[in-house]
Each structure stands twice: as C-alpha cells, then as structure tokens.
Amino acid sequence: MAAHCQVTGAQPGFGHSISHSHRRTKRRWNPNIQKKRYWVPSLRRNVTLNLSAKGIKVIDARGIDAVVNELIARGEKI
C-alpha cells in the first residue's frame, strides 16, 4: 500500500535520525495510512480509499459524497 493519502495528499517526510554523538542516518516519517471502505450512496457501490487519520476525520466532517465527488473531479482513481 502506497504511503499516500487520497484525500489530504499526505506523503512521507524525509530527514535524519541524530544520535547522541550527532551521527546522522537517513529515515522517513510515514503518515498513518489506513485502507478504509465506504458505501457511497450516489454511486451505489463501495469505494476503498487509502486515507490518513486526518483524511478519515475530513470524511466524517464533510461526508463521503462530497469527498468522492471532489476526488472524481480531480481525476483520482476510485
């Protein structure tokens, strides 16, 4: 599963882990991506989305129909 939220666009952040002696090693901060399935009444089918925790909250606040219509307008594969 790709570390990318379909609603918010959250992607991994990159940087360094810094030890006590200040040695730097590469690391990445992954977003909290969950695979969620929603019933979309306007499409009359289930839709599976890769969402961050914030993306799930956005759907709870705005509604699945509004978010899916925005994704379709953006050209996102659903």
UniProtKB/Swiss-Prot annotation:
Keywords: Ribonucleoprotein, Ribosomal protein. InterPro entries: Ribosomal_bL28 (IPR026569), Ribosomal_bL28/bL31-like_sf (IPR034704), Ribosomal_bL28_bact-type (IPR001383), Ribosomal_bL28_sf (IPR037147). GO terms for molecular function: structural constituent of ribosome. Residues 1-30 are annotated as: Disordered. It holds the Pfam family Ribosomal_L28. GO terms for biological process: translation. It comes from the Bacteria. Belongs to the bacterial ribosomal protein bL28 family. NCBIfam families: L28 (TIGR00009). This is Large ribosomal subunit protein bL28. The gene is rpmB.
